[in-house]
């Protein structure tokens, strides 16, 4: 009888321990889409997975590549993904329609957008006005091209004098190299790496950043599905915190970050991702604004100006407010977003 009681007690204790363990290790599933392929600019998210930052927050994150920085909006709107990376300026235009889901950005990844026009130096295209009379290749789904109208307005270009050819992502840089177009619209680091990897020297490549000619826009941001955001605010908060930790870790340990990329993207190589990583960190991620205010910082006055600027080339029917587009309620404290001195002074 004593043995039976002892055995029952042991079984009860084991069962309780099992329940306790399953509760302790319960993970909230999160479906997350990147804006593009597994490449260095998004390495912080991959590092957060590989180094267990999401897991430590109780999140089970599924990470998928994307099809362009506009498509992420559709993925979140449909509910097929809880979170996605996308161009915040395209979100501004999307939210102009009150019938569309109330998607918001919860983390600004790209403080300075990579939107650019790339050409060969020999073409003589040195300023935006030089694009008049030229043939420009641009994928319709590209985030940079999505902001073309705002760019030509800000830069004083006569859009009627620029011929645009809709090209696919895979043939964009090859068409430039073959001389089939005079210039291409893209994220600068994508075209730079493609052309450099094809053997072109830095001095042969000309990049016109749209932001240098009057465009005050932000770039890619993390967007949240409204239903998921409302039902799982803590999961969103934890995801943002772990992601910022991932980007700071990637900045401190670039080789680890690039290794995280290459394990998911065997088609790329270390040299290409090292170039892409450096260009992204130097030109798009660590701006003066971020060094001063921390990763993920958004200047509300600047965002308001960007909404106004988009409206100069896009006719609003229901102009969105800042609160329709972005919220900082999911950001961790400033101390967790601060840029360490060693990174702030670093040239990648």
Language-model region placement:
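Short, surface-exposed acidic
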Residues: 159-163, 202-206, 267-278, 316-325
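Secondary-structure end/capping motifs
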Residues: 231-315
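N-terminal secretory signal peptides that target proteins for export/translocation
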Residues: 1-5
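Pocket-lining segment of extracytoplasmic ligand-binding domains
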Residues: 170-174, 180-270
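N-terminal signal peptide c-region/cleavage motif recognized by signal peptidases
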Residues: 20-23
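N-terminal export leaders
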Residues: 6-10
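Conserved C-terminal helix/tail region of periplasmic/extracytoplasmic solute-binding proteins
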Residues: 303-348
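Short, glycine-/small- and polar/acidic-enriched structural segments
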Residues: 26-178, 182-189, 208-210, 215-216
């Amino acid at each position: 009888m004593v043995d039976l009681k002892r055995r029952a007690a042991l079984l009860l204790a084991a069962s309780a321990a099992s329940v306790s363990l399953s509760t302790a290790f319960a993970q909230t599933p999160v479906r997350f889409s990147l804006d593009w392929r597994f490449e260095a600019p998004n390495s912080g998210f991959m590092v957060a997975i590989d180094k267990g930052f999401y897991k430590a927050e109780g999140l089970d994150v599924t990470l998928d590549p994307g099809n362009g920085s506009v498509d992420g909006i559709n993925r979140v709107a449909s509910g097929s993904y809880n979170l996605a990376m996308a161009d915040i300026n395209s979100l501004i235009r999307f939210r102009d329609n009150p019938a569309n889901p109330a998607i918001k950005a919860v983390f600004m990844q790209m403080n300075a957008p990579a939107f650019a026009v790339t050409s060969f130096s020999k073409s003589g295209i040195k300023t935006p006005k030089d694009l008049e009379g030229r043939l420009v290749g641009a994928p319709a789904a590209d985030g940079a091209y999505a902001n073309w109208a705002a760019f030509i307005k800000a830069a004083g270009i006569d859009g009627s004098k620029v011929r645009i050819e809709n090209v696919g992502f895979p043939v964009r840089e090859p068409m430039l190299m073959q001389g089939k177009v005079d210039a291409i619209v893209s994220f600068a680091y994508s075209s730079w790496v493609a052309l450099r990897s094809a053997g072109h020297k830095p001095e042969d490549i000309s990049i016109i950043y749209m932001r240098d000619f009057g465009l005050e826009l932000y770039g890619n941001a993390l967007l949240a599905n409204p239903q998921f955001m409302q039902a799982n605010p803590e999961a969103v908060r934890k995801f943002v915190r772990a992601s910022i930790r991932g980007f700071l870790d990637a900045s401190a340990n670039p080789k680890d970050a690039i290794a995280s990329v290459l394990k998911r993207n065997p088609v790329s190589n270390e040299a290409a991702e090292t170039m892409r990583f450096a260009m992204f960190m130097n030109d798009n991620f660590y701006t003066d604004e971020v060094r001063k205010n921390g990763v993920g910082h958004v200047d509300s006055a600047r965002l308001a100006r960007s909404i106004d600027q988009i409206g100069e080339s896009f006719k609003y029917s229901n102009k969105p407010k800042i609160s329709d587009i972005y919220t900082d309620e999911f950001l961790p404290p400033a101390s967790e977003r601060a840029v360490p001195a060693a990174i702030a002074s670093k040239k990648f």
